[in-house]
Amino acid sequence: MTNQTVRGTKDFLFDEWYKFKHIEQTASRISNLYGFLPAQTPIFEYTEVFTKTLGDSSDIITKEMYSFNDKGGKSITLRPEFTAAIVRLLIEKKLQTPIKLFSTGPAFRYERPQKGRQRQFHQINFEVFGIEDPKADIELISLVQHLLTEFGINKNVKLEINSLGDGETITKYREALILYFTKYQNDLSEDSKNRLIKNPLRILDSKDEKDKSIISDAPKISNYYTKGSSDFFEQILNGLTILDIPYTVNNKLVRGLDYYCHTVFEFVTEDLGAQGAVFAGGRYDNLVSSVGGKHTPAIGFAGGIERIMELINYSPKEERPIYLIPIGREAEKHALTLANELRRNGLYVIYEYSGTLRTRMKKANQANAKAALIFGDEELSSKTLKIKNMNTGEEKIIARDNTIENIY
């Protein structure tokens, strides 16, 4: 037996777990302010839920999915992202739109582990269905900015945004890219050669050094916008300006999945090395209809909890315990009752079972207790307790019935 975590996974202990839960709980609280409803899906789905939605040229489909056949011979996949499963939920449950859904949990991709990238990772996920208005895009981006401010990292994380335009724009731009990249086909990386056939827009997302110089001179999508696409994008940029959200238009930003149209965006930082995206998302107006639902415009984004953890400074507020020190067998019989009473009044109690009084007082100091409650046969007979203020060393006798009122 190997007593270590699987490569690309990690344990969360103590303060690290408090930080994790702080991020999750903050996101949930902020989601309520924007009218999002909670939604949770299973961590695995039928494989076709993902293959039908993510596009056969995406790295997730071609390289990264954890898939297996169950005992009934069905192909099952651990979710690599949330949107496909949430779309499945929307269709299966016949949810009425417009609707905003918030979800959180683990996802799984077979990637090379590095800072900010694990094979099991956790996301906070926001999806808006049934709103075609660009104001939804603006509101969602402002929500990300709100989260960044809450986490105290808004100054180090910058918004990059692009528009892929409508269907007509994407078709024309696709043709232009095929024409351009075909001239350099022999110089492209193997991944980009494959993408040239399946989805040339994805070449723009390549991190391969062989591709970068070729990509730099590629046609710009803004030259192929229809008037509708151009107007839609302009409204979003104007809205961001009104909200004083700084941005950079990145013409090469396409995101890693094939279902996007119109708005795509990433909130990026240099503090995570190569894995610079903290939050990312975009619009996917045709995704729901492409998998059997009715036409439903949609936009969403996700943020990586582990990546946010790398960036934020968070220490849980230390809660100092009450240290319970019974002396003698009779006192020990009453100690559990007292501990239960204190805990049910919201107090953090450590009940020290054994040891000399000196040893237990030393442990109370080590635990940074705010008070010690000491009682033996004498206190039991007089229905009192001795309470010691661990800050000042002051001791006093209190009535057993007034314990809660006398806790420091």
From Swiss-Prot:
UniProt-listed InterPro entries: aa-tRNA-synth_II (IPR006195), aa-tRNA-synth_II/BPL/LPL (IPR045864), Anticodon-bd (IPR004154), Anticodon-bd_dom_sf (IPR036621), His-tRNA-ligase (IPR015807), HisRS-like_core (IPR041715), HisRS/HisZ (IPR004516)
Catalytic function, reaction form: tRNA(His) + L-histidine + ATP = L-histidyl-tRNA(His) + AMP + diphosphate + H(+)
GO biological process, one term: histidyl-tRNA aminoacylation
EC id: 6.1.1.21
SUPFAM superfamilies in alphabetical order: Class II aaRS ABD-related, Class II aaRS and biotin synthetases
Keyword annotations from UniProtKB, A to Z: Aminoacyl-tRNA synthetase, ATP-binding, Cytoplasm, Ligase, Nucleotide-binding, Protein biosynthesis
Enzyme's top EC category: ligase
Stored PROSITE patterns: AA_TRNA_LIGASE_II (PS50862)
Location in or out of the cell: Cytoplasm
One Gene Ontology term, aspect cellular component: cytoplasm
Molecular functions per Gene Ontology: ATP binding; histidine-tRNA ligase activity
Matches recorded under NCBIfam families: hisS (TIGR00442)
Family assignment from sequence similarity: Belongs to the class-II aminoacyl-tRNA synthetase family.
PANTHER family linked to this entry: HISTIDINE--TRNA LIGASE, MITOCHONDRIAL-RELATED, HISTIDYL-TRNA SYNTHETASE
Record text on subunit structure and interactions: Homodimer.
The name this protein goes by in its record: Histidine--tRNA ligase
